[in-house]
Each structure stands twice: as C-alpha cells, then as structure tokens.
C-alpha cells in the first residue's frame, strides 16, 4: 500500500513537470515569434494596417501601418540617391537597438533618405509618429510568420544579393539603387555612402 502511494506521488509530480514543460514550450512560441504576432495588436491598431502596392513616396505619415513588399523598397531605393534602411523591431529593447525616431532624425540631418521598416507587429502600435510612414514587412509571400525567416527572405529580395543576411546587422545602405552593404550600426551604413 505504501509503495502504491509513493508511485502515485511520483506520477503526480511527473505530470506536474510535464504540464510545466508544455506550458513553457507554448509560451516560448510567443517569445520566439512562432505565432502570428498580428493578433497581439490592439483592435484600433489592427484597423490601421493597410496593404499597399504603390510607391512608398506616395504614402503619408498618417498613423497607418503600411504593409510593403520587396519590390516597393527596391523602387524607392532606385528613386533616391542615398538610402539607409533600418530593419527595426518595435518591441525589442536593448542598448544596441536604435530608436526609429532617432534614426529618422539622424538621416535627415545627414541628407540621407530614411526607410525604417518594422519586422514585427509586436510593439508597432506604440511607435510614436516618425515623420515618415510606418512600414511593416508583408510576410505572406514568404509563407511563414517567423520573423527571423521572413526578414532574411525579404532583405534577400530587396538586396538581390546571394550573401547571407545577418539579422543582427540592421542597417542596409543603397546608393543610386545599388546595394552597398549590411551594417551593424547607423554610422557604418552612413560611412559606406560617402
């Protein structure tokens, strides 16, 4: 009898650990952006999400969240002499993550066209007015909602490069529509245009 209670207790503890492990795995799906983060936007922000296929220059800074494709970005880069794209994560807070507003201000101060493009919906509804349209990668063409995957595929299309895209290098510079490189800091990207 004593032995059965001990076995029952062991099974109960085992079940608790299995349940905790399963819960941890499910919550890590959210953290790793395995789930579609669009559904975490507030209803008001979801209503502001707009698919667009026109020129980025025609978009307004009107609090809409514009879904863009790689061809629109390539066209924009061809129409402007110096462009720096900032692949930013709105909810990613680290000392190395440049604020999108600061990025836009720094580009304007240096006579460079700023193109901050969000790679995730998480926190995008909290981004304050940038002075440029709020742009988000349209990930549906890549048939994945994992931001690491669709971001690499998107920038591979934008750059027309066979080089490996490193997600930690968040700045892409273009001169007269030609891809110059992928950089870790704004300063490196700016220097590449001089």
Segments from the language model and where they lie:
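N-terminal secretory signal peptides
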Residues: 53-81, 85
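Short active-site neighborhood of thiol/selenol oxidoreductases, capturing the structured segment around
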Residues: 74-102, 115-117
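C-terminal motif of bacterial Sec signal peptides marking the signal peptidase cleavage site
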Residues: 25-28
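Post-signal peptide N-terminal segment of mature Sec-exported envelope proteins
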Residues: 38-58
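Thioredoxin-like thiol-disulfide oxidoreductase module
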Residues: 122-168
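Bacterial signal peptide processing site
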Residues: 30-33
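A short, hydrophobic beta-strand/beta-hairpin element that forms part of a small beta-sheet core
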Residues: 165-182
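N-terminal secretory signal peptides that target proteins for export/translocation
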Residues: 1-12
